[in-house]
Amino acid sequence: MARDIGLNIPAPSEECNDSYCPFHGTLSVRGQILVGTVVSSKMDNTVVIERQYMKLVPKYQRYEKRRSKVHAHNPPCISAKVGDIVTIAECRRISKTKSYVVVKAEVPK
């Protein structure tokens, strides 16, 4: 039985025994919600998400492209793959580099 995580995101149809899953475990989500593309899923239960955004350069009054990479926990019930567009939510620190968890994954068109 999946629990409501407080976001407007439906629970995945699969069940998992992961304690770090926000739907089937005890991990609570709060804070930032980010959207990005999975660029690596080689680590165990971890994905690397790349976000692209525009940053204003005040001197020239123009925007420049920037990107950042974020590590996130990938629960077995979601299992995002490289190229998927994912929504990640902030949670308590899971490891040295992981403070986010994947809550939704979509295959791009």
Curated annotation (Swiss-Prot):
It holds the Pfam family Ribosomal_S17. Transmembrane segments: none annotated. Coiled coil: none annotated. InterPro entries: NA-bd_OB-fold (IPR012340), Ribosomal_uS17 (IPR000266), Ribosomal_uS17_arc/euk (IPR028333), Ribosomal_uS17_archaeal (IPR019978). GO terms for molecular function: rRNA binding; structural constituent of ribosome. HAMAP family: Ribosomal_uS17_A. Part of the 30S ribosomal subunit. This is Small ribosomal subunit protein uS17. It comes from Methanosarcina barkeri (strain Fusaro / DSM 804).
